[in-house]
């Protein structure tokens, strides 16, 4: 709800601006939030390592921007952005930077990172228990950062009726107080990712561990992502996402998420082994 609703609320705050900036390869709801608010949705190119390229943002787009979305670890590529650079970019231009950090607990290359490590002025960090604690059904999350912006969002959002029921709040608070289950889940995702890398490599598909997230971002043989999607479904019973779901820049790639149970993954591994024997 926050991702798709934020542009509308920000436009009420700054009616002279009409643009939402977001990574060119990203969760589709960033773009949809702009569309629902009647804003311009402007994708920001990524570099060769799938990190947002701030230098590619045009001055005229920055001057009209309501916000810049960043996502670390990124979905679908799992790359880690320079959040300090993103915060500095926004402050220099008066553009709020909203950092989607829902996968932060699943950072594999170095320690977890947050935009709040670079100060709170002009930034928001957005978190979700859907990923951290597997509590997607509760629709519980939180944002923190710039005091003025956080206060504004609280005061406007409460009139929309988007209030989390008390039992869901209590469950979310209990989950946030406990880190052990998060560590267990992170270790589980890491094992699953390693197993999926081995499965894909055994099929002749190049794959490697991401910097973060619980998904692999792989090149489709001959650049045909739909052929790979169909092959993995037919041969292994694995459902994947073609890269173009996340934007045109995803052409020729496939996202493979490590979200099946360990028992199901064992079946996939056996099927792959049988094919190679």
Please provide the spans of the model-predicted regions.
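PLP-dependent enzyme catalytic core of the Aspartate aminotransferase-like
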Residues: 231-240, 246-277
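Conserved glycine-rich beta-strand-loop-beta hairpin in the small C-terminal domain of fold type I
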Residues: 169, 173, 189-197, 207-219, ...
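Helix C-cap/helix->beta junction micro-motif
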Residues: 37, 92-93, 203, 236
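Active-site phosphate-binding strand-loop segment of PLP-dependent enzymes
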Residues: 48-109
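Short hydrophobic alpha-helical segments of the AMP-binding
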Residues: 10, 30-34
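Conserved core segment of the aminotransferase class I/II
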Residues: 119-190, 275-276
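Hydrophobic residues in well-ordered beta-strands that form the structural core
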Residues: 22, 43, 99, 240-242
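Phosphate-binding glycine-rich loop
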Residues: 1-19
């Amino acid at each position: 709800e926050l991702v798709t609703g934020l542009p509308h609320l920000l436009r009420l705050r700054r009616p002279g601006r009409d643009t939402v900036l977001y990574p060119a390869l990203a969760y589709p709801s960033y773009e949809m939030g702009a569309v629902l608010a009647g804003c311009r949705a402007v994708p920001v190119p990524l570099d060769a390592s799938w990190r947002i390229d701030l230098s590619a943002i045009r001055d005229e787009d920055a001057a009209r921007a309501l916000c810049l979305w960043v996502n670390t670890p990124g979905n679908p590529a799992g790359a880690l952005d320079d959040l300090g650079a993103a915060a500095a970019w926004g402050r220099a231009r008066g553009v709020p930077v909203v950092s989607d950090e829902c996968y932060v607990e699943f950072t594999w290359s170095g320690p977890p990172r947050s935009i709040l490590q670079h100060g709170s002025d002009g930034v928001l960090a957005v978190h979700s228990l859907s990923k951290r604690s597997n509590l997607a059904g509760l629709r519980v999350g939180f944002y923190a950062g710039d005091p003025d912006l956080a206060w504004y969002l609280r005061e406007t959002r409460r009139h929309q009726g988007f209030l989390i029921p008390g039992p869901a709040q209590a469950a979310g608070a209990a989950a946030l107080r406990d880190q052990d289950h998060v560590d267990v889940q992170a270790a589980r995702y890491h094992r699953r990712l390693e197993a999926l890398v081995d499965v894909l490599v055994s099929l002749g598909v190049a794959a490697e561990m991401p910097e973060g997230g619980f998904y692999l971002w792989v090149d489709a043989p001959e650049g045909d992502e739909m052929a790979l999607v169909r092959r993995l479904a037919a041969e292994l019973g694995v459902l994947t996402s073609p890269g173009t779901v996340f934007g045109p820049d995803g052409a020729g790639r496939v996202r493979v998420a490590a979200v099946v149970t360990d028992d199901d993954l064992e079946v996939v591994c056996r099927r792959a082994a049988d094919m190679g024997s």
